[in-house]
Amino acid sequence: MNAQELKKVAAAKALEFVQDGMRLGIGSGSTANEFIRLLGERVANGLHVIGVATSHYSEQLCRQVGVPVTTLEQIPELDLDIDGADEIGPNMTLIKGGGGALLREKIVAAASHEMLIIADETKVVKTLGAFALPIAVNQFGLSVTRSAIEKMAKGLGLSGKVTLRMNGDNPFKTDDGHFIFDASWGHIVQPKLLSNALFEIPGVIEHGLFVGLASRSIIAMADGQIKILEKKC
């Protein structure tokens, strides 16, 4: 099966965890988009749910396929958050934010009773870091913030480039107006330590390390079979 078909397989399995009346966190990215489309079909057939989307694009897609959406201001507590990931490491540690929605994705995950990840087997890794870590930063003081990130990384034994994400000739902006640094550090063996260190840097708004948020992952294998990974207590 190709990558797109595997995304659909994982998304379809995730629907089995959705119950009538649930308040859903709805993620962003190509795999989450497949889930949204399938969820729209279920809603058309009588399923009653309401969702909080993690990006403008996801919210627009929900509306297009008939999935009711609201905000965390209206529903501050969610039953289940379903989202994709760029990397799935040991014990459900994640790198997310390749699409730029990391801040909203983490807020929604934290507001949910459970976070369920959907992905294909290529996203499962032994050590995080092959995928560049997105770091959302304030536009003010970019060079100072980058220098602080690089200094912190060096102190933790991490090496690699920290580059400003671009959108054509201009810096990429998130839905909330932040810029993103992509940190190519190779291997991240202590994600919790790195997470804490990043949050100590003024100018860092959020980062794509998700530690302790996801409880399980639905993994579509190359042959179309499903594997469920769960966080250890």
Curated annotation (Swiss-Prot):
By its UniProt entry, which InterPro entries does this protein fall under? NagB/RpiA_transferase-like (IPR037171), Ribose5P_isomerase_typA_subgr (IPR020672), Ribose5P_isomerase_type_A (IPR004788)
Q: Where is it found, in Gene Ontology cellular component terms? A: cytosol
**Positions annotated to bind substrate:** 28-31, 83-86, 96-99, 123
Its EC top class is isomerase
Q: Which family does it belong to?
A: Belongs to the ribose 5-phosphate isomerase family.
Organism, by scientific name, is Bartonella bacilliformis (strain ATCC 35685 / KC583 / Herrer 020/F12,63)
The record lists the catalysed reaction(s) as:
aldehydo-D-ribose 5-phosphate = D-ribulose 5-phosphate
What's the protein here called?
Ribose-5-phosphate isomerase A
